[in-house]
């Protein structure tokens, strides 16, 4: 019997079933990020300023990545737009010749190779949809395999999305097509709807966002299939066959989003169906190239003060290269690193533009000055100073602030020079055999972050190979180095650019005598007529001695000077960041924290959550061993660890009820406890079901009322 406001609603005699709308459920409340910075545990007087600095810096980095992705996809999208605008020319001309009719049976199809980074496909296809709507046609539809198990659902989803793209969404006339959504999903009715809409569009309304496609009498319909590999073969075959029969009245263009290889088209479609497609291949930028560009714009630049240590960068790149190839995940990893840096490092308030950082140093409090003195890099710096200066740095706040401003400026100049020399060195080493210092600049960057690169065997090997470069190769590399140095707006390397230009001039001025000398020294001595072993060995020894004692040519001397110059640049400017005072202000080095958040082991995470819920819930009552107030699944998990291979459900339920009732201090004889026992039983069933879902137990027929305890490999 219902009570309260619903009593009158259930008083009917003839009705036996009553339907009620569910009560409004509050949405899950998400804690804003700034609340974490205002937490009492974060004992810092500038926590609000740190959060504001984080927000501004991330917005700058985010806008840079968005602009970068637009530039990377611009060429691909332009080619796709050209392809789509050239499709269905006979349809636009209303040509009725035999050749046109034959072509009407071929559906223009763009095979878009996006790569295996499936998580990035949505972003790319979303941008592509917007581009096509702005430049080609307003009728752009995207479908996923999970929404299209058969042709009926395929047409239903296709039709509903297509009608949402109709000419004027605010026009009442267009709503006449909505009846089609609920009644009929066939290609004939869709063609009729398209014909009616385009005729109305020609006379009454203008197509939304119809800019570059104004010459189209009837805009084409573009269908994008996300992850073509996920679609069933029969659905694709049926839809393509049906659509090809209606191309003369429904100008369809297909775009296949392919993650693997174009071969998938022939695997899913037989020749009789694939022959109905006019396929053109489009290749997006590879994942590794995309990663290199993102690193180049976000980290290998003095434009943004935030930097990653070697281990933190390796965590992000390893997740990218060995897990998902996702640029979006990599960018989220950088965002998480930035957030962790500003949250955990009190002096991250100085991780901003140099001018702003100097202003903030001037208003530092005594406690903030003490934070500077506690930095390990600053301690090492103080230890290397004269005694009088040490005392001033440790006792005089004014002198400390002035020196901090100077060190921050030195750190800024260090990064400018560092990245210029790094790019120059990469130009020299990226084309060497076997790539001793890596083929990608990120590999060279990680090596330079870790240690003094000139002490490594790889660097010495690379230098030996560079000393054997030909003149043309060396001149080409030096020209690229000049382009790198000229591209920098801040000239900090002194006369380095001029010296490289002087080297180029000297190479160009090598006269013919040096070439003849080089040829003469490289040619073998003449007159070796005897071929016996004794004379051959004697000749080889003479040639070796001649090579050892010969005077180097002008080219060899000049090449040696260039290599020595580059070696000195590396030793002067590619010092590891740990050698710089105050590097902790801008470098995030908590690689373990990053790994726990981004690359957690599922088994360890599950066991930790169930065995020690305090680790995640941060509830003081749950600290230590699992108390009675822990979540039900934690109690059930702890009890199941005490059982053998087969678990008696009755004993398990009684033990669970004993633990829970002890926590709630209920009287077993009371009426309330009898009602609660049913609730406890339901809670136990839910906990057992959750453990089964996680793979800890499974049903068994060996014994009645028993379940089998599982391990990760089996029973």
Curated annotation (Swiss-Prot):
CDD domains: Orc3. One of its GO terms (biological process) is neural precursor cell proliferation. Multi-mono-ubiquitinated by OBI1; ubiquitination is important for efficient DNA replication origin site activation. Ubiquitination levels are low in mitotic and early G1-phAse cells and are induced in late G1-/early S-phase, peaking in S-phase and decrease toward the end of the cell cycle. One of its GO terms (cellular component) is nuclear body. One of its GO terms (molecular function) is DNA binding. InterPro entries: ARM-type_fold, ORC3, ORC3_ins, ORC3_N, ORC_WH_C. It holds the Pfam family ORC3_ins. Keywords: Chromosome, DNA replication, DNA-binding, Nucleus, Phosphoprotein, Ubl conjugation. It is found in: Nucleus; Chromosome. The modification Phosphoserine is found at residue 523. Belongs to the ORC3 family. Component of ORC, a complex composed of at least 6 subunits: ORC1, ORC2, ORC3, ORC4, ORC5 and ORC6. ORC is regulated in a cell-cycle dependent manner. It is sequentially assembled at the exit from anaphase of mitosis and disassembled as cells enter S phase. Component of the origin recognition complex (ORC) that binds origins of replication. DNA-binding is ATP-dependent. The specific DNA sequences that define origins of replication have not been identified yet. ORC is required to assemble the pre-replication complex necessary to initiate DNA replication. Binds histone H3 and H4 trimethylation marks H3K9me3, H3K27me3 and H4K20me3. This is Origin recognition complex subunit 3. It comes from Mus musculus. The gene is Orc3.
